[in-house]
Each structure stands twice: as C-alpha cells, then as structure tokens.
Amino acid sequence: MNGYQISKLTVLCFFVNFVGAKAVAQESEDFDAAAKYQTTCFACHGTGQAHAPVVGDIIEWEIRLEKGLETLLQSTINGLNGMMPARGLCSDCTDDDLKAIVQYMIDESQ
C-alpha cells in the first residue's frame, strides 16, 4: 500500500468507528440493564467467578458500597486488580449504561 491508500483506509476506519459510536449512543436510550447484565455480567456476578460479588449477596455489595457508588462505577469502567476487566468487557456500553447495570445489580442485592 502506498501512503495515499493507507490514508484512505485510516479515514474509512475512523468514519466507521464514529458512525458505530453514534449508533451505540442512540441504542442506549432504550438500554435494558437487566438484559445486558444477563448477557455480559452474569458469568461472573451470577456465579462468583473471579471473586466477583454475586448479585443478591447483600453483605458483599454492602462492603463495596461503603466506598461509594462513584468508586464502584470507576472500578467498573477502569477494571480492578486484574480480576474485574475494564468495562466488564462490555465494549458497546456507555458509561451511563454501565452505571445502570451497576445500579441494577445493587437494587437486586438489597
């Protein structure tokens, strides 16, 4: 490939990524936290895999909530101690989507 072809490819990739990001943002308006939890988070938070707090375990969630919801959300976004992957491996989730999922798990654990 010459420089011109690489440049066209770069622009195309940027455009596709930009359009995809806008589509994700639009889809988030109708976001279903419970459904996304089932497809993305349940493998760990439904079973305790990798020491994840299990949804419904009041004590485990209370321990985490003592640090505050914002700290819990930042751990979700950035990952934690190599156990919790960044964004919970939900690459199509916005920060607001992740917050909704965290709130769903908290609500189900009280």
Segments predicted by a language model, with ranges:
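Axial heme c-ligation environment in periplasmic c-type cytochrome domains
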Residues: V54, S75-A100, M105-E108
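Local sequence-structure signature of Cys/Sec-based thiol-disulfide redox active-site neighborhoods
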Residues: F31-T39
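Gly/Gly-Pro-rich "capping" loops immediately C-terminal to redox-active cysteine motifs
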Residues: A43-Q74
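The canonical Cys-X-X-Cys-His
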Residues: T40-T47, I101, M105
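Residues at secondary-structure transition points
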Residues: S28-D32, G56-I59, I63, K67, ...
